[in-house]
Structures are given as structure tokens and as C-alpha cells.
């Protein structure tokens, strides 16, 4: 395949879904992708501009960003974090205020991020030369109120919130902890605070007060502090917002196009004849499990459909603008610009939707159809179904039991999901890298050589996933016992302290 006609690199973003211990799948997939993209970026063929996600996806994203910007071998970093370290014992709360906590992880995360300071002989790779955007999806427990663009005193509210950052190459792990109270790492902990085990996490949003007000939010607290929980259930536009984070990094630089990669271990679809037919009555537990698996995936599916519609609308705007170019005079164009700017002045509208007085017809039509400032984006999904399109993801993922927390109880499950993620990302690279990334043969060879050299020695064992419930009873029971004992002890200490 020939090289891209434009000398500008392709913009790549990576969006990751939630999934608690299924972050091990993210870790394996990111290891393969970062290894391959780094090889391709050496030839200026691609540019990783942003990563992001919610919950486990947010934590995997910040690890990926650090590895990319600091030149740390991603296979080592992801394996160390997701397979070796992230267990229920590490997440067990100290004070007993909730079953789980990020306190121990916060104390030890720098040992993972800075292996050289621990005297570890970790293979270094060339670090990125350009900044990287980081998007973190959040669930705002207080809620955000805004005025509706209707007559009367109507108000709407949302609990969908987020943080975005621009991280610099070579700045070390310090940038992940600054500013205190609203740093990238603290935002990630807030996003990953699944209510099934973690207490809410607070963030100081004082520095973003003007941003909230510019976007019509009327319920900003005086001290600027909100409490947050796992952002996965309510994140409405995960892919689009990671693309927005990339735009902050690109900031006018040329790109030949845009590719949005989505890592989704829970990428569910219709399977066999399950949940069809009058005679095949599903059990209560089957319905509960199916619903729990579908809810996180639906937000990503909806966003991918939205981007597909935007792509079609962008193309239609271009065609209509070309057809009407000779029919729209300066006076009519000015009137249309005024209409757009009057609409974008509504409290609930984004401040950057306003048009300049010299905007052309294409920009006006784009604003009127909701695609102002947007560019066509290609989307690709990497999921366990790449390994077996006919299989249910529960047959492929080892750590999905116990509401996706099962992997935290058993390292074997995390390891298998890590290997599964690597295998699925490698399959995608083999099938789609040439087309989706627009790489020539020379760059492709460098990419595949790098991935092959970094590949783990093992392959995922699907028997581990199928037998995960029965084979993990002992480690889960043992770890659960320690967790319960720790929380009972914490409860007793608090009870005695109040007497």
C-alpha cells in the first residue's frame, strides 16, 4: 500500500470503557497498540493525540499516557500495574469507611510509574515528542443545573461531568499529581470510585468555575468542591470527548485525518438465540447479568452511531454549500451568521459555537446542523469478539465474574485477560493497520517487528475464562475473608472511638 498523500500525520485517539478488573484487558491491548503506534510514529505516519475513558478505562489511560510520554516499555508498565499489583488486597480500605479504597494504591503508584527510582532494570523506549490529551469521565453526584432555552423558568440537570488535561513529554509523574485536589491522578481515582466498593471521591473544581459558567451551569458550589463516583454508567459521549481532548493538543497543527480507536471488553451483541423465543424463559439472574453487561457498552455504541451520523452530516454540508455557493449573497450570509450567533448565545450553548463575521457558507451550514468545528472521524473497535465473533464475552473474559471485580481476587484471571487484550489488539493490527492507519509497507514492517519483539511468551487460555467461577473459589473466598475482616475491624474501631 502506498504512503498517505499528505505529509501530515494521522491523528489517533484511544477511548477505553470501564469494567473494574477488566482493565487488565485494556492493559494488554494498550501494550500492543502503544508498541505498534510508537514504531509508526517514528516515521511521522501517525500521532497519538489523546487517550481517555471512565473508571478502569481512566486508570488504564493515565498509565498509557505516562508510558507514552516518558518512554517506559508499555508491556512492563501495564503488566506491573494490572496483573502484578492491582489486587483486592491493594485496594482494601484501611479505615473501614468503605470496603475498598485507593489509599494504598496512591502510596505505591509512583513505584510503578518510576521504576528507575526503584532500581528496576526496565527496558526504555523512545518517548513521545508531542503533548498528549487525557480525558477522564466522571459522575457528578451533586448534579449540574442549567437553564433551558425555552420560555419560562425551565431548568435541566445532568450528572455527566468530566476533566481534561494536556500532559507534556518528559515531565515525569509530577504532572500527574498537580495541582493538588484536582490533578489528573485524583480525577482518575474519582472516575474509578465504583459505588459497589468505593466511597465517593472529591475534586476541587475552583479553577474551572469560569468554564462551567460559560457552558451555562448555574449550580456551581461556593467552595468549588464536588463529590464524584464511577463515571461509566452516565458517560454519554466518551469517544467524542476524547476526540475533543485531542483537538486541544492539535491546536491548528495539520493532520491527514482522524482515527478513533475504542477498547471495549464488554462489546456485546446478539448471541445465538439467547433471549428470543416464547419457550426459552430466561432466569432472573440471566437477565440481571445480561443487563449489567449491556449498560456500559451502550454508551459507546450510541456515541459511535452519533459520530457516524456526524460524518454523514459533514459530507452533506459540504455538498449543499457547493450547490448553493452562487445563490447566497453577502447580505443573506450575514443574516445567517447572526442567526447562528444569536442561538449560540443561549446559556446552555457552548461559547465556542459562535461564528466570526467573515465565516463562509460551509461554516454557517455546519453550525446550523450541529457539526461546526467537527471533522470526519473513522472509528474502529477492539474487543474480545475479534478472537471469536460468535462467542459471548463472558466466555472469553476471565475476570468478569462478581460484577467485573472477580479479577481483583485472582491474579491468574487478570493475567489471562491481559493476554486476551494483547491478542485482540494484535489481531486488529494484522487485519486493519494498513487500511485504518494508512501505513506503507516499510512502516508496517517496523510496526509488526516491534509488536512481535515485545509480545508476551504466553497466549490467553480460554479454558481459564470458562472455568473462572469454580477454579477461583478458594482465592476469592480467602481474599474476601480478609476484606470482610478488615472492614469489621475498622467498624469496631470507629464504634469504640465514638464512645
Task: Specify the residue positions occupied by each region the protein language model found.
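Patatin-like phospholipase
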Residues: 7-15, 21-120, 133, 140, ...
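Extended hydrophobic secondary-structure segments that form protein cores and membrane-embedded regions
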Residues: 13-16, 48-55, 133-139, 226-231, ...
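P-loop NTPase catalytic cores that bind/hydrolyze ATP
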Residues: 127-143, 226, 233-240, 257-260, ...
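Active-site gating loop/helix substructures
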Residues: 132-251, 273, 278-308, 365-409
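Acidic, Ser/Thr-rich peripheral helices and adjacent loops at domain boundaries
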Residues: 274-361
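Long mid-to-C-terminal assembly/interaction modules of large eukaryotic proteins
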Residues: 354-355, 360-368, 402-419, 423-428, ...
Amino acid at each position: 500500500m502506498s504512503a498517505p498523500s499528505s505529509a501530515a500525520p494521522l491523528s489517533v485517539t484511544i477511548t477505553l470503557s470501564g469494567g473494574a478488573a477488566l482493565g487488565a484487558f485494556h492493559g494488554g491491548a494498550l501494550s500492543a497498540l502503544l508498541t505498534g503506534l510508537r514504531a509508526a510514529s517514528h516515521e511521522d505516519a501517525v500521532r497519538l493525540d489523546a487517550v481517555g475513558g471512565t473508571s478502569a478505562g481512566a486508570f488504564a489511560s493515565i498509565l498509557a499516557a505516562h508510558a507514552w510520554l516518558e518512554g517506559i516499555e508499555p508491556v512492563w508498565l501495564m503488566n506491573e500495574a494490572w496483573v502484578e499489583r492491582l489486587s483486592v488486597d491493594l485496594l482494601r480500605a484501611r479505615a473501614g469507611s468503605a470496603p475498598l479504597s485507593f489509599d494504598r494504591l496512591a502510596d505505591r503508584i509512583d513505584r510503578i510509574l518510576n521504576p528507575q527510582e526503584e532500581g528496576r532494570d526496565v527496558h526504555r523506549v523512545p518517548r513521545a515528542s508531542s503533548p498528549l490529551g487525557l480525558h477522564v469521565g466522571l459522575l457528578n453526584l451533586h448534579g449540574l443545573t442549567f437553564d433551558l432555552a425555552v420560555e419560562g423558568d425551565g431548568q435541566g440537570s445532568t450528572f455527566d461531568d468530566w476533566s481534561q488535561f494536556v500532559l507534556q513529554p518528559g515531565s515525569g509523574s509530577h504532572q500527574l499529581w498537580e495541582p493538588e485536589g484536582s490533578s489528573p491522578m485524583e480525577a482518575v481515582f474519582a472516575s474509578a470510585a465504583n459505588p459497589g466498593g468505593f466511597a465517593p471521591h472529591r475534586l476541587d473544581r475552583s479553577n474551572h468555575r469560569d468554564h462551567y459558567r460559560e457552558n451555562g451551569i448555574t449550580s456551581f458550589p461556593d467552595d468549588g468542591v464536588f463529590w464524584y463516583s464511577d463515571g461509566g454508567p452516565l458517560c454519554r459521549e466518551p469517544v467524542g470527548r476524547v476526540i475533543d481532548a485531542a483537538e486541544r493538543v492539535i491546536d491548528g497543527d495539520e493532520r491527514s485525518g482522524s482515527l478513533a480507536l475504542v477498547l471495549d471488553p464488554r462489546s456485546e451483541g446478539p448471541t445465538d438465540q439467547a433471549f428470543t423465543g416464547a419457550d426459552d424463559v430466561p432466569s432472573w439472574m440471566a437477565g440481571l447479568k445480561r443487563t449489567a453487561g449491556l449498560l456500559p457498552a451502550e454508551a459507546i455504541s450510541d456515541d459511535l452511531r452519533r459520530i457516524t451520523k456526524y460524518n454523514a452530516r459533514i459530507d452533506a454540508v459540504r455538498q449543499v454549500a457547493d450547490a448553493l455557493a452562487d445563490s447566497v449573497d453577502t447580505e443573506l450570509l450575514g443574516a445567517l451568521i447572526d442567526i447562528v450567533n444569536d442561538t449560540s448565545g443561549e446559556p446552555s450553548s457552548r461559547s465556542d459555537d459562535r461564528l466570526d463575521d467573515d465565516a463562509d457558507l460551509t461554516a454557517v451550514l455546519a453550525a446550523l446542523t450541529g457539526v461546526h468545528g467537527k471533522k470526519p472521524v473513522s472509528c474502529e473497535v477492539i474487543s474480545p469478539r475479534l478472537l471469536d465473533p460468535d462467542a459471548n464475552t463472558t466466555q472469553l473474559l476471565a475476570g468478569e465474574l462478581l460484577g467485573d471485580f472477580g479479577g481483583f481476587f485472582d491474579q491468574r484471571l487478570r493475567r489471562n485477560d491481559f493476554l486476551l487484550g494483547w491478542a485482540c489488539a494484535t489481531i486488529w493490527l494484522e487485519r486493519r493497520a494498513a487500511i485504518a492507519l494508512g501505513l506503507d509497507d516499510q512502516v508496517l514492517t517496523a510496526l509488526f517487528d516491534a509488536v512481535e519483539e515485545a509480545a508476551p511468551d504466553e497466549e490467553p487460555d480460554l479454558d481459564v475464562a470458562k472455568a473462572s467461577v469454580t477454579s477461583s473459589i478458594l482465592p476469592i473466598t480467602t481474599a474476601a475473608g480478609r476484606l470482610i475482616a478488615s472492614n469489621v475491624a475498622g467498624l469496631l474501631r470507629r464504634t469504640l472511638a465514638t464512645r
